[in-house]
Each structure stands twice: as C-alpha cells, then as structure tokens.
Amino acid sequence: MELQKQLLFTVIFTTYFIFIAGDDFYVTLGHLKVQTSDRVQTEAANGVVRRLISDKASLFQLTVDPNLGPVGKDTFKIVKEEGAEIVTIVGTSGVAATWGFHHYLKYYCHCHVSWDSDQLTLPEVLPTVNLTVTSADRFRYYQNVCTTSYSFVWWDWLRWEREIDWMALNGINLALAFTGQEAIWQRVYLRLNLTQDDISEHLSGPAFLAWMRMGNMRGFGGPLPNSWHRQSLVLQHFILDRMRELGIVPVLPAFAGHVPRAFKRLYPDASLSLMADWCNFRDEYCCPYLLDPTDPLFRTVGSMFLSELIAEFGTDHIYNCDTFNEMVPQTANLTYLAQVSNAIFSAMTAVDTTAVWMLQGWLFVNSMAFWGEAQTEAFLTSVPLGRMLILDLQSELNPQYKRLHSYYGQPFIWCMLHNFGGTLGLYGAVENVNQRVFEGRNLENGTMVGTGLTPEGINQNYVMYDLMTEMGWRTQPANLTEWFSLYAERRYGGVNIHADKAWQLLKSGVYNCTQDDYDMHGADIICLRPSLGSTEFVWYNTTELAMAWDELLDASEQFHEAANYQHDLVDLTRQILQVKGGELYGTLVTAFREGNITIFQENAQLLRTLLADLDLVLSSNKDFLLGRWLEAAKALGTTDLEKQLYEYNARNQITLWGPHGEILDYATKQWGGVVSHYYLPRWNLFLDALNSSLVEGVPFNQTFTAERIFNEVEVPFTLDTSLFPTLPQGDSVEIAKLVHLRWRRMLAQPAGQRIPYRRSRSSSLTVSSGQYRIFSFFAEQF
C-alpha cells in the first residue's frame, strides 16, 4: 500500500512538473491577468490611439478577443485590405491590441514613439497588411524599484498617462505600481502604536523612497508631508485604473521586514536586528531594524500592510518583496534561509491565498559571495514552485539563471538592466541583448517566462530599449545592420545616408560593449568630483565616434527641425565632449606631475572652455535641462516649505546623494545648469588649487581641496534655490556645428586608452557638526 502511494505521488508530481514546464507555469501564473472586461480593454486601447494620433485615430479600429491566440501568450492580428480605409487590429488583451497598433506604425508606416519625442508622419495611403504575431513568452515586464526614485518621482498624472500608453504600445503586460505605499504604511504604523514623530524620522524624502523601502537607509530628505500622502493615493488610483483597463498587471509591494527604530521600544521582545551600514550613511540616516521573518510579529505586520493595501487599491495577486537588497542575511545557515523565505511568502498568502512573490534577483549579483548554490536553493525552494517569479535583473551582462540552475525550478524573467542612477552616456551591449535572450529562452529545462526592462533610470539611450522591447515577440536575433538603418529612418522621419552611416558606426562601437565586467555606472571624469587619481576606460573606438558625429551633422539639412534628430545630435555632441574632457584631464594631470606649468595651464583652460561649451549645447534641448527636473519637483509642493524640501531632494539626488556625499555623483546628470553651476565650479576650484601648487611650489593637498569643493560648491548647490530655464536656449543644430568646429580637430585619443580615474561608490567626507542641518529645520516645520 505504501509503495502504491509513493508511485501515485511520483506520477502526480511528474505530471504536474511537466505541465508547468510545458505550459509556462500556467497552473501557478495563469491567474496573473486583470479582470477587466473585453469592452473596457477595447475602449482603453482605442484611447491610446486617440491620444497618440488624434487627427488620424478614426483610421484605426482596435478590439479585444481573448480567444485569438494560444493561452498564456498575447497575440495581435493586423488587417488592412487593399482599398479599405480602416486598419483593424485585434488583440487578446488591451495591451496586445495596442502593441499591434504600434507594430503597424513602426514597421509599416515608419513611425517612432519614444521617451524623447515622437515621429508620427503617416503615409497618405495606409499600407495593406495581414499579419498575426504571438508573443514568445508569457510576460513583458517593466521597471526597477529604483526607477520610481530616479525617474518617476516628480511625475504628475499626465506624465504617468503617457508612460502607461508607452507600456501598452510596447506590449508591457506586467509592471511595478509602487506609488502611494507610504500612505498605507502611515495608517499601519499608527495602528501599531507608533507616534507621528516615530514615523516621520523613518520615512525618507521623495527622491530617496526606493532605498528607504529596501531598508538601505531611513529618514534622509524627509519628513514626508501629509499632502504627499494625499496626492500619491489619488495618483496611484489613476495609475492602477489605467493599467488594469489596458490589461497591464500591476505589481504591488509586500512587507519586506524593514521597520522604524521605534519598533525596538514598542516591541522589545521581537527579534529585531539593525540593518548593516549601507554606503557609509551615518546613524542618523542609516540602519533601520529588520524584523526577522521567522518572528510571529512579521506575519502580523505583513498581513496588516497587505490587507490595508488591498482594501485601498485591490490586487492582481503579485507582490514585489526584496528583503536583502545590497544587504545579506545574518547567517548562511540553510535551514534559516529556507525558514525566512517561507515566512515572507506566508505573510502574503495569509491575506491573498493566490499570491505570487516577485523577487528582484539583484541580491544574487551584488552579494554573489554569500548566495552560493546551496544558500540560493534553500531560499528559493521553500516557496512552492511557480509561486515565486524572479527578475534576472542584469541578464545582458550578469545572468544568474545559468549559475543557479534556472533558479532551481522557479520561473524567471530575462531582464536588461542597462543603466544605473539614471546617468547619461552612450552605452549598450547590443550583441548581448540580441543573442542572449534566445539563449535563455532555449535553455534545456529552462524556466524563462518573459523578458523585461529594468533600468534604474530612463530617458537615455532609447535605441537599446526600442530593440529590447522587440525581444518579446522575436523568435530569432534581429539583423542589426538592417535594424539600425530602419531605426534611424523611423526616428528622424526619412532615409538619409549620413544618418544611416552614423548609426552603423554607433552600433559597432559605443553600443557594442562586449566586456561583461564593464562598470557601466556612468562614471565619467568630467562629471565627478575632481581628483588626481581618477581613471576611466573607453571601450569603443573614439575615432569612429567622431566619424559618427561628422555623419550625423551632415544629415542636418534634411533633419534640422526633427526633434529626435536634435536630441541625438546634442547627445552625441555631449558624448564627444565627455571623451575629450577625459583626454584633457589626463594631459593636465601628467603635466602637473611633471611640473610643466605651460602645458598644464593650456589644458586647464581648454577644459574650462569645454565645460562651458557642454553646458551651452545641453541647454539647447528640452531633454537636457536641470530646470525641468527642479520645476517638476516644486510643482508637487502645496506650500513654499514643501517646494523647498522637494527642490532640496531633487538637487541632492543628482549630486551629493546623501548629506555628506555618501553616494557622491552616482546619479549625476549631464544637464544644462548642472554643468555650469556644479561641474564647472568644482573644476575651477580644483584647477586653481593645482595651478597654485605649481606656481608657488607648494604641495597639493587633495583632502583639503575635496573639503573645499564639498563646502564651497556641492553643499551650496543642494541648498540653492536659483531658477533655471525650462525651455531650450538656442538652436541645437547650429550650436553643435560651432562646437564641432572648435573641437573636431582635437579628437585624437586612440581606442581603448585608459584615462586615469577609478571611482569608489562611497566617498563621504568628515565635516563639522552643525554644518549640515537643513533637516532639523524641515522637521520642525512639519
């Protein structure tokens, strides 16, 4: 009898496992779809069309038919018959229909939709087509938990509406929806007997919420005004309503265990441990408590939060939870790790019995030494197979699914991370993206169920995201030569041999980084606090980059008025000046070390001129303006004090990133206004100090100079309230031509040269007490 039971169990288990593997985890993930009616999704999809091409929207008819294609995958069908006026598009969801509409615009009308600008010139006669496309996987995912702070933090509903439209146009059917959670925590903490002061000292300012949520730090940039909570609740309802109307599944947050310091006072018997010091944040802002997931209080708090969240926003049964982001558990004991993950999951299922836990897989990259195979297997497999969905967060450079054996049976999404900190700088690993998605999808016994975009910041290098979104339907790698030619045509609105040559050079150069260990944190010499010991590696042929610049400028007669052409010309000019700035730095440092005053002074003056030119060209384009970032922040304030607080948050994040420069320049931005009022003053002070050392024959004091830069430039910039333009200043094309005339002949660096520079993620300074006390003022006022 016992043998029969064992055989029966084996048959059931084997059948179940094969069913999961063969049907994309249908049993455990099949319920992850919105419950919105076909009629509502149809109307929402047509709404996207109206907002995008209002004058031509009547030429397109979108409908939803969930039975159009195979279960578990999205399908769209596009039909435009000869002589007919209307293009009919049917999709299995609102997202699928909208995706099909974008596919038609892109590949039949040669149009372009992007974060930068749109090119929507439709042909007089719409092309005929009869095409059916089915997605390659179950999911197309979007967002990184950090994107909410680096890019989305100051968005109003109009900007969110545009982004949700963009998601649908690109087939995104799974996305984070993190707005408003602090308002929920406010309610929960009050029910748990915390005072308002307890809560205020824990919740960070808006620009730093992502890292407060993950337990990396607390309180900095706060306190959060009540108006922020009210606004974010309203905004989250708008976001969720629209996502669900279109068929996009929102991923809500779950309790990860990070709690305010007040928990120690209120719950002295609970198992609480201080989180580790993250990036040298001092005690005032570091180290919240971690409530051990195995403690009964964890389930209580987690259930309270999730119940309150669902009562407010509803649910689609998938929750993100990252307990150990850039932190490690207190022990590597396998039993403990299994208990921890099981307890985290149980806190979800106590409220939602069909909950799926989404885990960002960054911990397996960032703390690889801790997360060995045994530790990872123990942590992952204590959750039922298929009830955890893992984001393989940086698959294009650091895929973990091979090392961790397809996450020991848990499904995962192949993600392109691509960007850290929302920094600017031309970069891509285009060959990796074009090949490795299919390696993951075709892996024997693999558990890949989707593709994803997981940048820390957006509004940069759109070409990489345009390609990556296509991996959701492609069944084999793209012909990149052809693809880049078509990209230039779509983006600028016409065929031009010079634009095509420019993009082919960029494809094979700056967008084809083949070094998996390349540090792509956007750490460029001119953007960082000056020192004598900096190095930077240029992985591409800078001669070819300069040739691309020549070619793109030669396309100006045809595309002078094209918004995306102007953007790209500014961006490429910015990259050229960035590279040249690194060259000048290397030359002047060598001259300083050799005591050659003449060469030093010549190159120091050239660097000052270069930075002025950089600010000039950046200020000519809407997408590179500090003023837009600051005004968006202030617009959310309901009082002068709130506007002041939000502006401080906005300025600090892109410069000091912390009260004392804990993550200095990690999220630096090459924007007009930042260069002139932050980068250039730092370089002026540094170059003046070096010059004095040479002329007067006294030793250069790097520590003293860094302290001066901190106190005289960096801190004042974060506290300043000067206004900056929100509209472009000057003609981008004409300014780029002038910059080209000045600098083109001086571009001579050979490919692969190392420029002295090496960056540490943490570079905080020691300053006197009372020197940096803005937060006490804000706290008193709120």
Located regions from the model:
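Extended, compositionally biased alpha-helical segments that mediate assembly or anchoring
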Residues: 671, 675-759
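C-terminal substrate/ligand-recognition segments
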Residues: 535-560, 565, 570-593
